[in-house]
């Protein structure tokens, strides 16, 4: 098994960046929550994606899933799992310096303030939003999901995760 490329991030707090490659959690990369970014994060580039595959262990016999994120996503990694980064790079989420935008995934209380937000679509039916209570396997932990046909108002609790795809804007509104 070939281990991926590790390098120091030029961004926040000397975070380690894990490039495309193969990583056994607990051996090659520490367990925890990670942000996975596309190579092109300029201007919230909607056509740039990152792709990872996560396996239950390093035998690759039990695939948890293949995930593709627009701009960036968040995922929890546990000891013994096997992560394959095909496209993009990963960095510890607490050191990733994520700021709210119109695409990607955000944790309330760390990347954005908890509260009520209005999400407006880029164009009718072009995007979606989802709320998760955990980012270990995504769909098992989804609280809410909707396509964006018109502006919607969502309440985001501390610790919840908001995923946006092709939103035109997001703004905080009074609770």
Model segments located where?
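A glycine-anchored, Pro-Gly-centered beta-turn/N-cap motif
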Residues: 19-21, 25-33, 104, 108, ...
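Primarily secretory-pathway and cell-envelope proteins
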Residues: 1-16, 40-100, 123-175
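Secreted/periplasmic proteins that engage bacterial cell-wall peptidoglycan
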Residues: 27, 32, 38-39, 43-46
């Amino acid at each position: 098994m070939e281990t991926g490329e590790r390098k120091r991030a030029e961004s926040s707090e000397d975070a380690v960046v894990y490039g495309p490659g193969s990583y056994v959690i607990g051996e090659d990369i520490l367990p925890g929550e990670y942000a996975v970014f596309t190579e092109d994060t300029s201007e919230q580039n909607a056509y740039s994606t990152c792709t990872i595959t996560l396996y239950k262990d390093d035998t690759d016999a039990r695939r948890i899933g293949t995930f593709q994120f627009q701009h960036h996503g968040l995922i929890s990694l546990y000891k013994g799992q096997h992560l394959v980064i095909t496209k993009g790079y990963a960095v510890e989420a607490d050191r990733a310096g994520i700021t709210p935008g119109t695409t990607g995934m955000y944790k309330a209380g760390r990347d954005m303030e908890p509260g009520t937000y209005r999400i407006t679509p880029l164009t009718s039916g072009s995007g979606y939003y989802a709320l998760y209570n955990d980012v270990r396997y995504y769909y098992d932990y989804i609280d809410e999901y909707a396509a964006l046909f018109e502006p919607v108002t969502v309440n985001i609790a501390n610790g919840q995760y908001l995923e946006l795809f092709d939103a035109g804007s997001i703004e905080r509104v009074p609770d």
